[in-house]
């Protein structure tokens, strides 16, 4: 909820409509924000992101993604209700088609994520969230959120258009153009 509220604050302070891009777990955040500010959002773009329907959780979908390589490398921190990935999996799991300097940078910038966003059911309505056009960019070589689960999500929750890129989970680093 903290992340959603921060995004809502940014949307509220923006002039005109915004385009939200959600990557990975942040698909959840942009979806919930669209429920609360649909009139301020031109479109939603999901980049290898969790596109979860009303009443469901990210955990329900990630548990079906049996080909993903990240799960054994998740460290949990109950005292802060957060988790993070072990750096040893960064290259193989997130950046396998990127230069090594990208993996080195990731070791400095990736941080803990709230567990709550993955286990809290989304509260979405057709009138609000459903009124915002959705687009999906599938990363077909993704080892974190595999093509299987990406396809399942954008098939269950329709998008105006689906684009496919033969990239890892991080095309903004491997194929920025």
Q: Where are the regions that the model predicts?
A:
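Active-site loop/oxyanion-hole signature of alpha/beta-hydrolase fold enzymes
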Residues: 1-19, 35-36, 59-63
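Alpha-helical elements of Rossmann-like donor-binding domains used by nucleotide-donor carbohydrate transfer enzymes
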Residues: 2, 6-10, 32, 89, ...
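Short coil/turn segments at beta-strand junctions that form active-site/ligand-binding loops
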Residues: 16-17, 42, 132-133
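Gly/Ala-rich beta-loop-alpha elbow adjacent to hydrolase catalytic centers
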Residues: 21-26, 30
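Flexible "cap/lid" loop of the alpha/beta hydrolase fold
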Residues: 35, 40-41, 45-79, 83, ...
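Conserved alpha/beta-hydrolase catalytic His-Asp/Glu region
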Residues: 80-128
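Conserved serine/cysteine hydrolase catalytic core
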Residues: 112-176
């Amino acid at each position: 909820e903290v992340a959603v509220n921060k995004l809502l604050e940014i949307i509220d302070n923006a002039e005109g409509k915004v385009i939200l891009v959600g990557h990975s777990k942040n698909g959840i955040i942009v979806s919930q924000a669209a429920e609360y500010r649909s009139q301020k959002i031109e479109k939603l773009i999901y980049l290898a992101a969790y596109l979860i329907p009303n009443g469901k959780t990210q955990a329900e979908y990630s548990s079906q993604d049996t080909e993903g390589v990240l799960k054994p490398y998740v460290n949990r921190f109950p005292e802060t209700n957060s988790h993070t990935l072990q750096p040893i999996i960064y290259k193989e799991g997130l950046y396998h088609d990127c230069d090594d300097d990208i993996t080195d940078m990731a070791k400095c910038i990736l941080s803990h994520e709230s567990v709550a966003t993955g286990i809290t059911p989304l509260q979405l309505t057709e009138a609000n969230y459903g009124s915002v056009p959705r687009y999906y960019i599938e990363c077909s070589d993704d080892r974190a959120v595999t093509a299987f689960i990406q396809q399942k999500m954008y098939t269950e929750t329709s998008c105006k258009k689906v684009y496919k890129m033969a990239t890892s989970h991080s095309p903004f680093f491997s194929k920025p153009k």
